[in-house]
Amino acid sequence: MPAPVNIPSMFDTILVLDFGSQYSHLITRRLREFNVYAEMLPCTQKIAELPWKPKGVILSGGPYSVYAEGSPHVDHAVFDLGVPILGICYGMQELAWINGKGVHAGEKKEFGHATIHVEKPSDPLFHGIDNFQVWMSHGDKLNALPTGYEVVATSDNSPYAGIAHTSEKIWGIQFHPEVTHTTKGKQLLQNFAVDICGAAQKWSMENFVDTEIQRIRDLVGPHAEVIGAVSGGVDSTVGAKLMKEAIGDRFHAILVDNGVMRLNECENVKKTLGEGLGINLNVVDAADLFLGKLKGVTDPEKKRKIIGNTFIEVFEEEAAKIQPTHPEAGEIEFLLQGTLYPDVIESISFKGPSQTIKTHHNVGGLLDNMKLKLIEPLRELFKDEVRKLGEIMGIPHDLVWRHPFPGPGIAIRVLGEVTPSQVEIARKADFIYIEEIKKAGIYEEISQAFACLLPVKSVGVMGDQRTYEQVIALRAIETVDFMTADWYIFDANFLKTVARRIVNEVPGVARVVYDITSKPPATVEWE
Protein backbone atom coordinates (compact mmCIF):
# COMPACT_ATOMS: atom_id res chain seq x y z
CA MET A 1 0.00 0.00 0.00
CA PRO A 2 1.57 3.35 -1.02
CA ALA A 3 2.22 5.90 1.72
CA PRO A 4 -0.27 8.79 1.59
CA VAL A 5 1.24 11.95 0.10
CA ASN A 6 0.97 15.12 2.16
CA ILE A 7 -0.70 18.22 0.74
CA PRO A 8 2.41 20.49 0.61
CA SER A 9 4.06 17.94 -1.65
CA MET A 10 1.18 18.22 -4.11
CA PHE A 11 0.69 21.99 -4.27
CA ASP A 12 3.15 24.89 -4.38
CA THR A 13 3.27 25.89 -0.72
CA ILE A 14 4.23 29.04 1.18
CA LEU A 15 5.59 28.21 4.63
CA VAL A 16 4.44 30.60 7.39
CA LEU A 17 6.68 30.43 10.46
CA ASP A 18 4.70 31.59 13.49
CA PHE A 19 6.34 33.74 16.18
CA GLY A 20 3.15 33.94 18.23
CA SER A 21 1.28 36.82 16.60
CA GLN A 22 -2.48 36.93 17.03
CA TYR A 23 -2.61 37.53 13.27
CA SER A 24 -0.42 34.62 12.08
CA HIS A 25 -3.33 32.44 10.98
CA LEU A 26 -4.64 35.31 8.85
CA ILE A 27 -1.50 35.17 6.69
CA THR A 28 -2.36 31.60 5.78
CA ARG A 29 -5.99 32.51 5.08
CA ARG A 30 -5.11 35.46 2.85
CA LEU A 31 -2.73 33.38 0.73
CA ARG A 32 -5.35 30.69 0.22
CA GLU A 33 -7.91 33.31 -0.80
CA PHE A 34 -5.97 33.79 -4.04
CA ASN A 35 -5.49 30.02 -4.47
CA VAL A 36 -1.97 29.62 -3.11
CA TYR A 37 -1.64 26.85 -0.53
CA ALA A 38 0.00 27.96 2.72
CA GLU A 39 0.86 26.04 5.85
CA MET A 40 1.76 27.42 9.26
CA LEU A 41 4.39 25.89 11.53
CA PRO A 42 6.00 27.18 14.74
CA CYS A 43 9.08 29.37 14.34
CA THR A 44 11.09 26.65 16.10
CA GLN A 45 10.59 24.28 13.15
CA LYS A 46 13.84 22.58 12.13
CA ILE A 47 14.14 23.07 8.39
CA ALA A 48 16.06 19.79 7.95
CA GLU A 49 13.02 17.93 9.35
CA LEU A 50 10.62 19.49 6.86
CA PRO A 51 9.50 16.71 4.45
CA TRP A 52 8.76 19.18 1.65
CA LYS A 53 10.35 22.32 0.21
CA PRO A 54 8.34 25.54 0.25
CA LYS A 55 8.19 27.98 -2.64
CA GLY A 56 8.71 30.82 -0.18
CA VAL A 57 8.80 31.57 3.55
CA ILE A 58 6.99 34.21 5.60
CA LEU A 59 8.20 35.08 9.11
CA SER A 60 5.19 36.26 11.12
CA GLY A 61 4.88 38.99 13.70
CA GLY A 62 5.10 38.25 17.40
CA PRO A 63 4.77 39.84 20.86
CA TYR A 64 8.46 39.58 21.73
CA SER A 65 11.57 41.75 21.40
CA VAL A 66 14.28 40.10 19.30
CA TYR A 67 16.99 41.45 21.60
CA ALA A 68 15.43 40.10 24.82
CA GLU A 69 16.75 36.95 26.46
CA GLY A 70 14.63 33.92 25.62
CA SER A 71 13.03 35.47 22.54
CA PRO A 72 12.34 33.04 19.68
CA HIS A 73 14.63 32.90 16.67
CA VAL A 74 14.31 31.12 13.35
CA ASP A 75 16.43 28.16 12.28
CA HIS A 76 19.21 29.75 10.20
CA ALA A 77 18.85 26.88 7.72
CA VAL A 78 15.81 28.70 6.35
CA PHE A 79 18.23 31.01 4.53
CA ASP A 80 19.85 28.02 2.83
CA LEU A 81 16.60 26.97 1.14
CA GLY A 82 17.24 29.40 -1.69
CA VAL A 83 13.64 30.65 -1.71
CA PRO A 84 12.26 34.19 -1.20
CA ILE A 85 11.62 35.29 2.39
CA LEU A 86 9.24 37.94 3.74
CA GLY A 87 9.52 39.13 7.35
CA ILE A 88 6.45 40.79 8.86
CA CYS A 89 6.88 43.07 11.91
CA TYR A 90 8.80 40.84 14.38
CA GLY A 91 9.83 38.80 11.34
CA MET A 92 11.45 41.90 9.83
CA GLN A 93 13.23 42.65 13.10
CA GLU A 94 14.46 39.05 13.15
CA LEU A 95 16.02 39.58 9.72
CA ALA A 96 17.86 42.66 10.99
CA TRP A 97 18.91 40.94 14.23
CA ILE A 98 20.40 38.00 12.35
CA ASN A 99 22.21 40.50 10.14
CA GLY A 100 23.77 42.06 13.25
CA LYS A 101 21.96 45.36 12.98
CA GLY A 102 20.24 47.09 15.87
CA VAL A 103 16.65 46.75 16.90
CA HIS A 104 15.54 48.85 19.85
CA ALA A 105 12.45 50.01 21.66
CA GLY A 106 10.89 52.86 19.74
CA GLU A 107 10.41 56.23 21.38
CA LYS A 108 6.90 56.19 20.00
CA LYS A 109 5.02 52.92 19.62
CA GLU A 110 2.89 52.41 16.54
CA PHE A 111 -0.48 50.77 17.15
CA GLY A 112 -3.30 51.33 14.70
CA HIS A 113 -3.58 52.98 11.31
CA ALA A 114 -0.60 54.50 9.50
CA THR A 115 0.22 55.62 5.98
CA ILE A 116 2.92 53.78 4.06
CA HIS A 117 4.90 55.76 1.51
CA VAL A 118 6.24 53.55 -1.27
CA GLU A 119 9.76 54.87 -1.91
CA LYS A 120 10.63 52.43 -4.69
CA PRO A 121 7.59 51.68 -6.88
CA SER A 122 9.70 49.38 -9.06
CA ASP A 123 10.26 46.97 -6.17
CA PRO A 124 8.38 43.72 -6.99
CA LEU A 125 6.82 43.48 -3.52
CA PHE A 126 5.11 46.84 -4.03
CA HIS A 127 4.31 46.37 -7.73
CA GLY A 128 1.09 48.20 -8.59
CA ILE A 129 0.81 49.66 -5.09
CA ASP A 130 0.90 53.40 -4.34
CA ASN A 131 0.90 54.97 -0.89
CA PHE A 132 -1.69 53.16 1.24
CA GLN A 133 -3.19 52.72 4.71
CA VAL A 134 -1.84 49.90 6.88
CA TRP A 135 -2.22 48.45 10.36
CA MET A 136 0.77 48.83 12.67
CA SER A 137 1.26 46.89 15.90
CA HIS A 138 4.80 47.22 17.22
CA GLY A 139 6.89 48.89 19.89
CA ASP A 140 10.38 48.01 18.64
CA LYS A 141 11.93 49.37 15.47
CA LEU A 142 15.10 49.21 13.39
CA ASN A 143 17.71 51.87 14.10
CA ALA A 144 19.97 50.95 11.18
CA LEU A 145 19.60 49.44 7.73
CA PRO A 146 20.96 45.86 7.58
CA THR A 147 23.90 45.25 5.25
CA GLY A 148 22.83 44.63 1.65
CA TYR A 149 19.31 46.00 2.18
CA GLU A 150 17.69 49.12 0.77
CA VAL A 151 14.67 51.11 1.90
CA VAL A 152 11.59 50.50 -0.24
CA ALA A 153 8.88 51.98 2.02
CA THR A 154 8.58 54.39 4.95
CA SER A 155 5.94 55.63 7.39
CA ASP A 156 5.79 58.88 9.35
CA ASN A 157 7.25 57.11 12.39
CA SER A 158 9.47 54.54 10.66
CA PRO A 159 12.18 55.22 8.09
CA TYR A 160 12.43 51.44 7.57
CA ALA A 161 8.78 50.44 7.09
CA GLY A 162 9.83 48.30 4.12
CA ILE A 163 13.31 46.97 3.31
CA ALA A 164 14.60 44.67 0.59
CA HIS A 165 17.70 42.62 -0.13
CA THR A 166 17.04 42.27 -3.83
CA SER A 167 19.83 39.84 -4.74
CA GLU A 168 18.91 37.46 -1.89
CA LYS A 169 15.16 37.96 -2.48
CA ILE A 170 14.50 38.85 1.16
CA TRP A 171 11.99 41.53 2.23
CA GLY A 172 10.95 42.95 5.56
CA ILE A 173 7.91 45.10 6.35
CA GLN A 174 7.00 46.77 9.64
CA PHE A 175 3.22 46.51 9.16
CA HIS A 176 0.63 43.73 8.92
CA PRO A 177 -0.56 43.03 5.35
CA GLU A 178 -2.72 40.12 6.54
CA VAL A 179 -5.33 42.20 8.41
CA THR A 180 -8.25 43.83 6.62
CA HIS A 181 -7.27 47.28 7.97
CA THR A 182 -4.30 47.21 5.55
CA THR A 183 -6.00 48.33 2.36
CA LYS A 184 -3.63 46.73 -0.16
CA GLY A 185 -2.25 43.97 2.02
CA LYS A 186 -3.74 41.13 0.02
CA GLN A 187 -2.20 42.50 -3.18
CA LEU A 188 1.19 42.76 -1.46
CA LEU A 189 0.99 39.14 -0.29
CA GLN A 190 -0.02 38.07 -3.79
CA ASN A 191 2.94 39.96 -5.23
CA PHE A 192 5.20 38.01 -2.88
CA ALA A 193 3.67 34.54 -3.25
CA VAL A 194 2.81 34.55 -6.96
CA ASP A 195 5.15 37.03 -8.65
CA ILE A 196 8.25 36.71 -6.47
CA CYS A 197 8.01 33.09 -5.27
CA GLY A 198 6.37 31.79 -8.44
CA ALA A 199 3.74 29.77 -6.56
CA ALA A 200 1.09 28.35 -8.88
CA GLN A 201 -2.46 29.39 -7.99
CA LYS A 202 -3.86 25.86 -8.05
CA TRP A 203 -5.17 25.49 -4.51
CA SER A 204 -8.94 25.09 -4.72
CA MET A 205 -11.56 22.77 -3.35
CA GLU A 206 -12.17 21.52 -6.89
CA ASN A 207 -8.54 20.33 -6.98
CA PHE A 208 -8.54 19.22 -3.35
CA VAL A 209 -11.50 16.84 -3.48
CA ASP A 210 -10.01 14.24 -5.84
CA THR A 211 -6.63 14.52 -4.14
CA GLU A 212 -8.15 13.92 -0.71
CA ILE A 213 -10.29 11.00 -1.84
CA GLN A 214 -7.17 9.29 -3.18
CA ARG A 215 -5.28 10.09 0.03
CA ILE A 216 -8.04 8.44 2.06
CA ARG A 217 -7.93 5.34 -0.13
CA ASP A 218 -4.15 5.11 0.20
CA LEU A 219 -4.34 5.50 3.98
CA VAL A 220 -7.21 3.11 4.66
CA GLY A 221 -6.27 0.49 2.08
CA PRO A 222 -8.62 -1.92 0.29
CA HIS A 223 -10.08 -3.71 3.32
CA ALA A 224 -10.07 -1.66 6.55
CA GLU A 225 -13.30 -0.15 7.82
CA VAL A 226 -13.84 3.30 9.33
CA ILE A 227 -16.34 4.62 11.87
CA GLY A 228 -17.22 8.21 12.67
CA ALA A 229 -19.73 10.25 14.60
CA VAL A 230 -22.05 12.59 12.72
CA SER A 231 -24.21 15.32 14.16
CA GLY A 232 -25.94 17.05 11.27
CA GLY A 233 -23.39 19.86 11.27
CA VAL A 234 -21.35 20.85 8.24
CA ASP A 235 -17.98 19.48 9.42
CA SER A 236 -19.13 15.96 10.22
CA THR A 237 -21.35 15.84 7.12
CA VAL A 238 -18.57 16.91 4.73
CA GLY A 239 -16.16 14.48 6.40
CA ALA A 240 -18.68 11.65 6.08
CA LYS A 241 -19.37 12.46 2.43
CA LEU A 242 -15.62 12.37 1.67
CA MET A 243 -15.35 8.96 3.33
CA LYS A 244 -18.37 7.70 1.38
CA GLU A 245 -16.81 8.82 -1.91
CA ALA A 246 -13.47 7.25 -1.00
CA ILE A 247 -14.42 3.86 0.50
CA GLY A 248 -18.19 3.51 0.08
CA ASP A 249 -20.03 1.48 2.70
CA ARG A 250 -16.82 0.60 4.51
CA PHE A 251 -17.44 3.90 6.29
CA HIS A 252 -19.99 3.60 9.10
CA ALA A 253 -21.53 6.85 10.36
CA ILE A 254 -23.04 6.80 13.84
CA LEU A 255 -25.60 9.37 14.96
CA VAL A 256 -26.22 9.35 18.70
CA ASP A 257 -29.52 10.96 19.71
CA ASN A 258 -28.60 12.37 23.11
CA GLY A 259 -31.96 13.98 23.76
CA VAL A 260 -30.57 17.51 23.54
CA MET A 261 -30.43 17.97 19.78
CA ARG A 262 -32.39 20.51 17.75
CA LEU A 263 -36.07 19.97 16.96
CA ASN A 264 -36.55 17.12 14.44
CA GLU A 265 -32.76 16.81 14.11
CA CYS A 266 -32.55 13.02 13.96
CA GLU A 267 -35.17 12.73 11.26
CA ASN A 268 -33.49 15.47 9.24
CA VAL A 269 -30.07 13.80 9.50
CA LYS A 270 -31.48 10.42 8.48
CA LYS A 271 -33.15 12.00 5.48
CA THR A 272 -30.15 14.11 4.43
CA LEU A 273 -27.22 11.78 5.13
CA GLY A 274 -28.82 8.37 4.85
CA GLU A 275 -31.32 8.86 2.05
CA GLY A 276 -29.96 11.94 0.28
CA LEU A 277 -26.19 11.34 0.38
CA GLY A 278 -26.29 7.54 0.58
CA ILE A 279 -24.10 7.36 3.68
CA ASN A 280 -24.11 4.13 5.69
CA LEU A 281 -25.83 5.54 8.80
CA ASN A 282 -26.53 3.96 12.17
CA VAL A 283 -28.85 5.88 14.51
CA VAL A 284 -28.85 5.25 18.26
CA ASP A 285 -31.69 6.53 20.44
CA ALA A 286 -30.01 7.21 23.77
CA ALA A 287 -32.08 10.23 24.82
CA ASP A 288 -33.40 8.64 28.02
CA LEU A 289 -29.89 7.56 29.05
CA PHE A 290 -28.41 11.04 28.61
CA LEU A 291 -31.32 12.89 30.22
CA GLY A 292 -31.29 10.46 33.12
CA LYS A 293 -27.64 11.17 33.82
CA LEU A 294 -28.24 14.92 33.56
CA LYS A 295 -31.01 14.88 36.16
CA GLY A 296 -30.26 17.28 38.99
CA VAL A 297 -27.09 18.65 37.36
CA THR A 298 -26.85 22.44 37.01
CA ASP A 299 -23.11 23.11 36.63
CA PRO A 300 -22.30 23.65 32.91
CA GLU A 301 -18.90 21.92 33.06
CA LYS A 302 -20.45 18.87 34.72
CA LYS A 303 -23.07 18.81 31.97
CA ARG A 304 -20.33 18.80 29.33
CA LYS A 305 -18.42 16.00 31.02
CA ILE A 306 -21.52 13.85 31.50
CA ILE A 307 -22.51 14.26 27.85
CA GLY A 308 -18.96 13.63 26.62
CA ASN A 309 -18.39 10.53 28.75
CA THR A 310 -21.83 9.10 28.03
CA PHE A 311 -21.30 9.68 24.33
CA ILE A 312 -18.11 7.63 24.42
CA GLU A 313 -19.90 4.78 26.20
CA VAL A 314 -22.77 4.73 23.70
CA PHE A 315 -20.49 5.11 20.68
CA GLU A 316 -18.24 2.22 21.76
CA GLU A 317 -21.24 -0.01 22.39
CA GLU A 318 -22.74 0.76 18.99
CA ALA A 319 -19.41 0.36 17.17
CA ALA A 320 -19.05 -3.13 18.63
CA LYS A 321 -22.29 -4.14 16.88
CA ILE A 322 -21.12 -3.11 13.41
CA GLN A 323 -20.63 -6.04 11.07
CA PRO A 324 -18.23 -6.09 8.07
CA THR A 325 -19.87 -4.84 4.90
CA HIS A 326 -18.59 -7.71 2.71
CA PRO A 327 -16.65 -10.98 3.15
CA GLU A 328 -13.30 -9.38 2.24
CA ALA A 329 -13.76 -6.46 4.61
CA GLY A 330 -11.26 -6.07 7.40
CA GLU A 331 -11.45 -4.84 10.96
CA ILE A 332 -12.57 -1.37 12.02
CA GLU A 333 -9.19 0.34 12.17
CA PHE A 334 -9.89 4.07 11.83
CA LEU A 335 -11.93 6.75 13.57
CA LEU A 336 -13.03 9.76 11.52
CA GLN A 337 -12.54 13.08 13.28
CA GLY A 338 -13.62 16.49 11.99
CA THR A 339 -10.47 18.39 12.93
CA LEU A 340 -10.16 21.67 11.00
CA TYR A 341 -7.03 23.72 10.32
CA PRO A 342 -7.76 26.27 13.09
CA ASP A 343 -7.65 23.34 15.56
CA VAL A 344 -4.24 22.36 14.18
CA ILE A 345 -3.01 25.96 14.40
CA GLU A 346 -4.16 26.15 18.02
CA SER A 347 -2.09 23.10 18.85
CA ILE A 348 1.14 24.22 17.15
CA SER A 349 1.14 27.97 17.77
CA PHE A 350 4.37 29.28 19.30
CA LYS A 351 2.27 30.64 22.15
CA GLY A 352 2.46 27.08 23.39
CA PRO A 353 0.73 23.86 22.43
CA SER A 354 -2.77 23.49 23.77
CA GLN A 355 -3.45 20.52 25.99
CA THR A 356 -5.56 18.84 23.35
CA ILE A 357 -6.81 19.61 19.89
CA LYS A 358 -10.54 20.15 20.11
CA THR A 359 -12.34 16.93 19.32
CA HIS A 360 -15.77 16.31 17.89
CA HIS A 361 -18.15 15.62 20.76
CA ASN A 362 -15.21 14.73 23.02
CA VAL A 363 -14.42 11.52 21.13
CA GLY A 364 -10.70 11.72 21.88
CA GLY A 365 -10.98 8.94 24.47
CA LEU A 366 -12.21 6.55 21.80
CA LEU A 367 -8.76 6.36 20.24
CA ASP A 368 -7.23 4.82 23.34
CA ASN A 369 -10.20 2.71 24.37
CA MET A 370 -10.83 1.18 20.95
CA LYS A 371 -7.22 1.04 19.68
CA LEU A 372 -8.19 3.03 16.60
CA LYS A 373 -6.09 5.16 14.29
CA LEU A 374 -7.20 8.68 13.51
CA ILE A 375 -8.24 9.86 10.06
CA GLU A 376 -8.77 13.61 9.61
CA PRO A 377 -9.65 14.47 5.99
CA LEU A 378 -10.45 18.13 6.79
CA ARG A 379 -7.42 18.99 8.92
CA GLU A 380 -5.86 21.22 6.22
CA LEU A 381 -9.03 23.29 5.72
CA PHE A 382 -10.52 26.45 7.16
CA LYS A 383 -14.29 26.58 7.77
CA ASP A 384 -15.02 28.53 4.58
CA GLU A 385 -13.08 25.92 2.60
CA VAL A 386 -15.11 23.12 4.22
CA ARG A 387 -18.32 24.85 3.15
CA LYS A 388 -17.03 25.25 -0.40
CA LEU A 389 -16.02 21.58 -0.47
CA GLY A 390 -19.47 20.58 0.73
CA GLU A 391 -21.14 22.49 -2.09
CA ILE A 392 -18.81 20.94 -4.68
CA MET A 393 -19.74 17.46 -3.43
CA GLY A 394 -23.45 18.17 -3.76
CA ILE A 395 -24.38 18.58 -0.10
CA PRO A 396 -27.55 20.72 0.17
CA HIS A 397 -26.87 24.45 0.50
CA ASP A 398 -28.93 24.81 3.69
CA LEU A 399 -26.84 22.17 5.42
CA VAL A 400 -23.51 23.54 4.20
CA TRP A 401 -24.32 27.00 5.56
CA ARG A 402 -25.83 25.84 8.84
CA HIS A 403 -24.84 27.71 11.98
CA PRO A 404 -22.54 25.94 14.46
CA PHE A 405 -24.19 23.86 17.17
CA PRO A 406 -22.36 22.95 20.39
CA GLY A 407 -21.46 19.33 21.12
CA PRO A 408 -23.41 19.34 24.42
CA GLY A 409 -26.37 20.66 22.45
CA ILE A 410 -29.36 22.25 24.13
CA ALA A 411 -28.05 21.05 27.50
CA ILE A 412 -25.95 24.23 27.67
CA ARG A 413 -28.81 26.33 26.32
CA VAL A 414 -31.03 25.27 29.19
CA LEU A 415 -29.49 27.17 32.08
CA GLY A 416 -29.93 25.14 35.22
CA GLU A 417 -31.23 21.58 35.40
CA VAL A 418 -31.84 19.82 32.09
CA THR A 419 -35.21 18.06 32.03
CA PRO A 420 -37.27 16.80 29.07
CA SER A 421 -39.79 19.62 29.53
CA GLN A 422 -37.09 22.30 29.69
CA VAL A 423 -35.39 20.92 26.59
CA GLU A 424 -38.71 20.98 24.74
CA ILE A 425 -39.29 24.65 25.60
CA ALA A 426 -35.77 25.64 24.50
CA ARG A 427 -35.81 23.69 21.23
CA LYS A 428 -39.28 24.95 20.21
CA ALA A 429 -38.30 28.56 20.89
CA ASP A 430 -35.07 28.05 18.95
CA PHE A 431 -36.94 26.52 16.02
CA ILE A 432 -39.29 29.52 15.78
CA TYR A 433 -36.39 31.98 16.04
CA ILE A 434 -34.35 30.32 13.29
CA GLU A 435 -37.45 29.89 11.12
CA GLU A 436 -38.12 33.64 11.27
CA ILE A 437 -34.47 34.46 10.54
CA LYS A 438 -34.65 32.32 7.40
CA LYS A 439 -37.98 33.88 6.37
CA ALA A 440 -36.35 37.31 6.65
CA GLY A 441 -33.55 36.20 4.31
CA ILE A 442 -30.78 37.09 6.77
CA TYR A 443 -29.67 33.64 7.96
CA GLU A 444 -26.34 33.75 6.11
CA GLU A 445 -25.62 37.29 7.34
CA ILE A 446 -25.54 35.90 10.88
CA SER A 447 -22.66 33.72 12.08
CA GLN A 448 -24.64 32.03 14.84
CA ALA A 449 -28.09 32.44 16.35
CA PHE A 450 -29.97 30.51 19.02
CA ALA A 451 -32.48 30.70 21.84
CA CYS A 452 -31.71 29.68 25.40
CA LEU A 453 -33.94 29.11 28.40
CA LEU A 454 -33.09 31.11 31.51
CA PRO A 455 -33.47 29.71 35.06
CA VAL A 456 -35.80 32.53 36.11
CA LYS A 457 -39.51 33.21 35.96
CA SER A 458 -41.32 36.42 35.12
CA VAL A 459 -44.82 37.77 35.63
CA GLY A 460 -46.95 38.09 32.52
CA VAL A 461 -50.55 38.51 31.37
CA MET A 462 -52.32 36.12 28.98
CA GLY A 463 -55.88 37.19 28.28
CA ASP A 464 -57.25 38.25 31.66
CA GLN A 465 -55.03 35.84 33.56
CA ARG A 466 -51.82 36.60 35.43
CA THR A 467 -48.99 34.22 34.49
CA TYR A 468 -45.67 33.47 36.14
CA GLU A 469 -43.54 31.58 33.65
CA GLN A 470 -40.10 31.33 32.11
CA VAL A 471 -37.85 33.64 30.10
CA ILE A 472 -36.23 32.97 26.71
CA ALA A 473 -33.08 34.85 25.72
CA LEU A 474 -32.26 35.25 22.03
CA ARG A 475 -28.65 35.55 20.83
CA ALA A 476 -27.28 36.37 17.36
CA ILE A 477 -23.71 37.31 16.51
CA GLU A 478 -21.53 38.34 13.58
CA THR A 479 -17.92 37.19 13.55
CA VAL A 480 -15.08 36.24 11.23
CA ASP A 481 -13.24 33.78 13.46
CA PHE A 482 -15.38 33.38 16.63
CA MET A 483 -12.48 34.80 18.66
CA THR A 484 -14.33 38.11 18.84
CA ALA A 485 -17.95 38.77 17.92
CA ASP A 486 -20.50 41.59 17.71
CA TRP A 487 -24.20 41.19 18.38
CA TYR A 488 -26.40 41.32 15.29
CA ILE A 489 -28.63 44.38 14.91
CA PHE A 490 -32.13 43.18 14.02
CA ASP A 491 -34.99 45.34 12.84
CA ALA A 492 -37.27 46.04 15.83
CA ASN A 493 -40.31 44.64 14.01
CA PHE A 494 -38.45 41.37 13.45
CA LEU A 495 -37.79 40.99 17.18
CA LYS A 496 -41.41 41.87 17.90
CA THR A 497 -42.59 39.08 15.58
CA VAL A 498 -40.25 36.48 17.09
CA ALA A 499 -41.18 37.41 20.67
CA ARG A 500 -44.91 37.29 19.90
CA ARG A 501 -44.64 33.87 18.24
CA ILE A 502 -42.57 32.34 21.04
CA VAL A 503 -44.86 33.58 23.82
CA ASN A 504 -47.99 32.48 21.93
CA GLU A 505 -46.72 29.14 20.59
CA VAL A 506 -44.41 27.81 23.31
CA PRO A 507 -46.23 26.88 26.53
CA GLY A 508 -44.36 27.94 29.65
CA VAL A 509 -42.79 31.16 28.29
CA ALA A 510 -43.90 34.60 29.51
CA ARG A 511 -41.08 36.85 28.32
CA VAL A 512 -38.44 37.09 25.55
CA VAL A 513 -35.24 39.18 25.78
CA TYR A 514 -32.42 39.86 23.30
CA ASP A 515 -28.76 39.59 24.31
CA ILE A 516 -26.74 42.62 23.10
CA THR A 517 -23.38 41.66 24.64
CA SER A 518 -20.31 41.40 22.41
CA LYS A 519 -17.47 38.89 22.76
CA PRO A 520 -15.50 39.81 24.81
CA PRO A 521 -16.61 40.31 27.53
CA ALA A 522 -19.25 37.61 27.00
CA THR A 523 -18.78 34.27 25.28
CA VAL A 524 -21.03 33.26 22.39
CA GLU A 525 -22.86 30.56 24.38
CA TRP A 526 -24.36 31.35 27.76
CA GLU A 527 -22.82 28.25 29.34
From Swiss-Prot:
XMP binds at R304, D464, K519, E525. Its main location: cytoplasm. It is found in: Cytoplasm, Cytosol. The active site is at C89, H176, E178. ATP binds at S231, G232, G233, V234, D235, S236, T237. It is an enzyme of class 6 (ligase). Its EC number is 6.3.5.2. Residues 203-402 form the GMPS ATP-PPase domain. Pathway: Purine metabolism; GMP biosynthesis; GMP from XMP (L-Gln route): step 1/1. It catalyses: XMP + L-glutamine + ATP + H2O = GMP + L-glutamate + AMP + diphosphate + 2 H(+). Homodimer. This is GMP synthase [glutamine-hydrolyzing]. The lineage of its organism: Eukaryota, Fungi, Dikarya, Ascomycota, Saccharomycotina.
